[in-house]
Curated annotation (Swiss-Prot):
Record's protein name: Ribonuclease P protein component
Organism, as annotated: Synechococcus sp. (strain JA-2-3B'a(2-13))
Catalytic reactions of this protein: Endonucleolytic cleavage of RNA, removing 5'-extranucleotides from tRNA precursor
Lineage: Bacteria, Bacillati, Cyanobacteriota, Cyanophyceae, Synechococcales
E.C. designation(s): 3.1.26.5
UniProt keywords, alphabetically: Endonuclease, Hydrolase, Nuclease, RNA-binding, tRNA processing
Pfam families: Ribonuclease_P
Protein family membership: Belongs to the RnpA family.
Length: 133
């Protein structure tokens, strides 16, 4: 689970990202991001996930993918530049990704968008090839 200050939950924030967010695309994910409104400087960046039915009609598979993405993002949250809203949107082929590929895709998109405070951060967690249960 993402730390509470890093969760994007506001419907209007999701809509604002869809309408005016900058976009970075990878093979399995699209990242939408934009700075928070004025007066929100210094607030930790907030992250939202969208896993649509195009990925799988099975809610079990979509929820599993959502849990995996949250676990990948959790250790990265302290290293995100403050004051941004981020939205990761899945593509249909994301279900075929294995854990290391998924982790690399998220890290690549964050670097592409220049949203990491330092790029030498190990985004893999404690064990680089271990998959959480």
């Amino acid at each position: 689970m993402l730390p509470a200050p890093h969760r994007l939950r506001d419907r209007r924030a999701f809509q604002a990202l869809y309408q005016g967010g900058q976009r970075r695309s990878g093979a399995g994910l699209t990242l939408l991001f934009q700075p928070m409104p004025a007066g929100c400087e210094g607030i930790p960046s907030q992250v939202g996930l969208v896993i649509g039915r195009k990925v799988s009609k099975s809610a079990v598979k979509r929820n599993r993918l959502r849990r995996q993405l949250r676990e990948i993002l959790r250790p990265l949250c302290p290293n995100l530049k403050p004051g941004y809203r981020l939205l990761f949107i899945s593509k249909a082929n994301l279900l075929t990704y294995r854990w290391p590929e998924l982790r690399a895709e998220v890290h690549r998109l964050l670097q592409k968008a220049d949203l990491l405070v330092s790029t030498d951060v190990d985004s893999t967690g404690a064990d680089s090839d271990a998959k959480p249960s």
